Amino acid sequence: CLVGSEMCIRDRDQAVRRILTVKFELGLFDETYGDPKLVKKVVRNAEKVALAKKVADESAVLLENRNDILPLDLNKYKSVAVVGPNSNQAVLGDYAWTMGDTKEAVSLLQGLQESAGDKIMIRHAEGCDWWSQDKSHIAEAVEVVRNSDIAVVAVGTRSTYLGRSPKYSTAGEGFDLSSLELPGVQEELLKEIKKTGKPMIVVLIAGKPLAMPWV
């Protein structure tokens, strides 16, 4: 918005109003630390969880759809390769992360497995991590793709809570990158998979802008 414009002031007022409303509902203006019993009533109730899912669903943006490959028709394929560092990583945002046993979110791999059931074979390999120059697992991912009818490749960044686990993070508070390109060897992973000639869907899961004009 334009500084000083009526729209800018209205937008700021709305943002502040939302924050203050939640604080009032949590009792933070009556007690410094509020009432812990109110948290699930105000923040983690069914309505708020449903809203969070709706926001996540609507955040997906389709950049390109060559040959109408999307939406993915699982009835057309006998096997799907799900690869990439973000293929089995459920991402909640820059101020939260998930573990392998979480019930708070569903990864791309888990979602496809649940959707496919026993109808098709789902093969998985990460191929590389988010940040390092380790290429030793790319060949494994390429082989998984060769043995499948189509590849779904999830690349991007990884966020953690308040700068924790910096070795494995490439986005979020306190994580700046020197380039807008995909971190690590993810670009090479994509190019090697492309060489297989198999149909390929690229899913970008990122907490910051990335330049990928070649995809």
How would you name each of these model-derived features?
Residues C1-G4, I9:
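Single conserved hydrophobic/aromatic residue that forms the stacking wall/gate
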Residues S5, G34-V42, T170:
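A short small-residue
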Residues S5-E6, T21, A50-V215:
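C-terminal non-catalytic regions of proteins with extracellular/luminal or membrane-system context
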Residues R17, T21-V39:
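Conserved, charged catalytic cores of large soluble enzymes
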Residues R44, K48:
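Metal- or metallocofactor-binding catalytic centers and their adjacent structured scaffolds
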